[in-house]
Amino acid sequence: MSNVVVCALYKFVSLPHFESLREPLLSMMEQAEIKGTLLLASEGINGTVAGTQAAIDALLAWLNNQNGLENIVYKLSFDDEMPFYRTKVKLKKEIVTMGVEGIDPLKVVGTYVKPQDWNALISDPEVILVDTRNDYEVQIGTFKNAINPVTETFREFPDYVKQNLDPAKHKKVAMFCTGGIRCEKSTAYLKEQGFEEVYHLEGGILKYLEEVKQEESLWEGECFVFDNRVAVDHDLKKGQYDQCNACRMPITEAEKLSPAYVQGVSCPHCIDKISDEQRKRFVERERQVNLAKSRNEAHIGSDVNQVIEARRQKKEALRQQSAEKNKAKQ
């Protein structure tokens, strides 16, 4: 049974003193041995973390006791291994970056649609279905007949709307994303632009996969996630994709057989895009990763003090073994 609980959470809420939450939240996560990243901003909280069930329960209880963070939206999935290396709490201008001033999901937002009602909505021929995620996410899975805006970042989404959608022509627009947070902003943006009937999938793709049976599902492929699992299947288990550590693109086993694929250095997606300087840096990073593995240490995101302590204990154990051997010879 998978013993690592992965928790994706967010909440749009006014947090005028969000900076003061960072240290106590980080301390709580470190004490509970929770890894992952949470973002704090004046507009709320967002992120994905992982730990034991008890640790995640403790985190959710802690957040529920903070003014404004009660009843936070979260989705759980499971993994056999810890999908994160670090524990981080970052202070940001936005908890999901669209880059458009004045968009506030607390004031105006699209109509939430439950996973159980989603199929009926997107099967309506009058509904335009738009995937708000980035192109590399869409490539490995999306809903049947969904439009791919082919964006590299969420900042590009407003330009896509301006160039391709018209409130006079597109009367009904439905949108979706991984966990729901990008749709909060995208639907708020469309409402501000004059679109009247705007819908979004409540809880995002992850909630849909959790609640809708696979035989009834209109989801095709796997769902990209922002952790070391890379993607999850319809059962929310780790999927078939790996990830290029150079460009972060999801890659298949077939792509890993390509001459362009060098572990940690390049893949077919980025071989022609990285500079010689980047390549040298990636080669050195991979060397450090392999060196850390040979010492049975985690490289990326390891707590330096933990690594030093592990080395000290190893040396001390070797010293004691040597002393015992010398004593036996006497």
UniProtKB/Swiss-Prot annotation:
Catalytic reaction list = uridine(34) in tRNA + AH2 + O2 = 5-hydroxyuridine(34) in tRNA + A + H2O
What SUPFAM superfamilies does the entry give?
Rhodanese/Cell cycle control phosphatase
Per UniProt, residues of the Rhodanese domain are: 123-217
Molecular function GO labels: oxidoreductase activity, acting on paired donors, with incorporation or reduction of molecular oxygen
Catalytic residues identified in the record: C177
| Superkingdom to which the source organism belongs | Bacteria
Which keywords describe this protein according to UniProt? Oxidoreductase, tRNA processing
Which EC numbers characterise this protein's activity in its record? 1.14.-.-
Q: Which GO terms describe its biological process?
A: tRNA modification
SMART domains noted in UniProt: RHOD
Which InterPro entries did the record assign?
Rhodanese-like_dom, Rhodanese-like_dom_sf, TrhO, TRHO_N
Task: Indicate the family of this protein.
Answer: Belongs to the TrhO family.
**Function (record text):** Catalyzes oxygen-dependent 5-hydroxyuridine (ho5U) modification at position 34 in tRNAs.
UniProt-listed PANTHER family:
RHODANESE-LIKE DOMAIN-CONTAINING PROTEIN 7-RELATED, THIOSULFATE SULFURTRANSFERASE/RHODANESE-LIKE DOMAIN-CONTAINING PROTEIN 2
User: What's this protein's name?
Assistant: tRNA uridine(34) hydroxylase
Cite the source lineage: Bacteria, Pseudomonadati, Pseudomonadota, Gammaproteobacteria, Alteromonadales
Q: Which gene encodes it?
A: trhO
